[in-house]
Amino acid sequence: MVGKGIGLLVILAIAVGITPAFALTELERTSINDPQLVNAFGTPLGNSINVDQQIQISADVMNNQEKSQKIAYLVQVKDEAGFVVSVGWVVGVELNPHQEFKQSISWIPKESGKFTAEIFVWEGFPINHNALSDYTSIQISVS
């Protein structure tokens, strides 16, 4: 009986020994930094733009893991009432461990108003998708 207890203790000690104390949660695998509106050349535009002005909804995506990660960068734009007026995505980007990559989606507003762009980073899109980080948002004023 003592032998089984010691064996279990050894297995438990090995399992605890290889589990990192700093393991990332599912939503910490990537981070979304510096969300902004930019023109086609990457010049920041601020949050006030014009109707029919083509912009890029941009952010830096950081892979916080010790392994490579394929991502999908998704942006949905909502109007003041919360209705989605635009959805765009880029798939197939692979980030190396701790790599940061600037990604963007183009949008041309067709009417004036207040909008919110929500930026998501997922894996497995469009099938079996999982969030890799919390989403972030940008407020946009169109005149």
What are the language-model segments listed below?
Residues 82-90, 128-129:
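Surface-exposed loop/edge segments in extracytoplasmic proteins
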Residues 63-67, 81, 111, 125:
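Short, acidic/polar linear motifs in exposed loop/turn regions
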Residues 1-27, 59, 75:
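Secretory targeting signatures
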Residues 24-51, 143:
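Short, compositionally biased P/S/T/A/G/V-rich stretches that sit at domain boundaries
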Residues 56-64:
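Short edge beta-strand/loop segments characteristic of extracellular beta-sandwich folds
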Residues 103-111:
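Short, hydrophobic beta-strand segments
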